[in-house]
């Protein structure tokens, strides 16, 4: 047909080469070239960890293509001063005169199959950062996202460790009933103040706080960053606070059986489920975010949350002994 528009179903970055022939003769050729042009990249997630994992690759895209990037995140203030060459805009705001537009996220069809028009590879089989890198057509290298600087006076003699015990699903929690208490007791006995920086309070979704911790008062995320920067380490689960600690270059101990040991950042002290235990449901199946007690393999049985129940306090303390 003549005089018609056409659009490719693929929505991730492909450096297209388009050739149009007439009677076997090349009539028109166009090669993708974003240099000097305006490209819009949107973060599809409100989650702290997702934003911290992904924004670095928006900058890598800008540098690769030497283009003008307009990015939308739900926490622009965290990044705007560290990425002066990116124009940050509020999600939902109109952006005009664009050469290309991409959206970073985990996309599924109604039947829970992966939307391979938006994700070039099943995102469950990739690290959180490689998933973003793939959507933006980049060669993957782990990059630590830069976030706003804090003017914090660091006392090298201060013996403080931050912990974050809560997440957005019970499967993300460290479900060993004595795990946190044993680790807090060990730290207290070594003279460390243990600062709890999770915003949730005691008995949140039936989860008790360990004794011997100092609860950081709820407030701006910047104050949590300050406490982390003062600390010798952060101990957390597969949540945004672990990504925040890692982004701040604070030694990060990450306890998770919900995901496989390759799913988050590599430069951390990672404790996973012992060999032979059920693990990695997040990297095998689509998370049902509406089911707080989602445990697709063993829900309702004695093996529910086996992955993190089987992670012992001794396993965590062994990692802490490497640098505390």
Regions found by a protein language model. Give the residues of each.
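Catalytic machinery of carbohydrate-active enzymes
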Residues: 1-324
């Amino acid at each position: 047909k003549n005089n018609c528009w056409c659009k490719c179903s693929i929505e991730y970055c492909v450096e297209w080469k388009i050739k149009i022939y007439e009677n076997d003769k090349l009539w028109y050729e166009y090669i993708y070239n974003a240099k000097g042009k305006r490209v819009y990249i949107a973060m599809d997630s409100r989650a702290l960890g997702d934003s911290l994992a992904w924004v670095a690759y928006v900058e890598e895209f800008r540098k690769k293509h030497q283009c003008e990037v307009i990015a939308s995140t739900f926490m622009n203030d965290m990044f705007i001063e560290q990425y002066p060459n990116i124009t940050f805009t509020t999600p939902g705001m109109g952006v005009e005169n664009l050469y290309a537009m991409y959206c970073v996220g985990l996309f599924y069809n109604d039947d829970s199959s992966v939307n391979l028009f938006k994700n070039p590879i099943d995102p469950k089989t990739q690290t959180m950062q490689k998933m973003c890198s793939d959507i933006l057509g980049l060669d993957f290298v782990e990059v630590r996202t830069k976030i706003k600087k804090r003017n914090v006076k660091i006392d090298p003699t201060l013996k403080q460790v931050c912990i974050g015990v809560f997440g957005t699903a019970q499967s993300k929690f460290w479900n060993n009933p004595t795990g946190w208490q044993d680790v807090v007791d060990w730290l207290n006995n070594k003279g460390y103040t243990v600062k709890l920086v999770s915003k949730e309070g005691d008995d949140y979704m039936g989860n008790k706080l360990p004794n011997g911790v100092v609860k950081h008062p709820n407030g701006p995320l910047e104050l949590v960053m300050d406490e982390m920067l003062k600390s010798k380490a952060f101990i957390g689960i597969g949540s945004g606070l672990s990504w925040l600690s890692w982004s701040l270059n604070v030694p990060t101990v990450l306890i998770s059986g919900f995901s496989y040991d390759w799913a988050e950042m590599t430069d951390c002290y990672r404790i996973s489920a012992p060999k032979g235990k059920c693990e990695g449901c997040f990297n095998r199946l689509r998370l049902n975010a509406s089911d707080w007690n989602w445990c697709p393999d063993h829900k309702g049985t004695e093996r529910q949350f086996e992955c993190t129940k089987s992670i012992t306090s001794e396993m965590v303390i062994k990692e802490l002994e490497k640098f505390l």
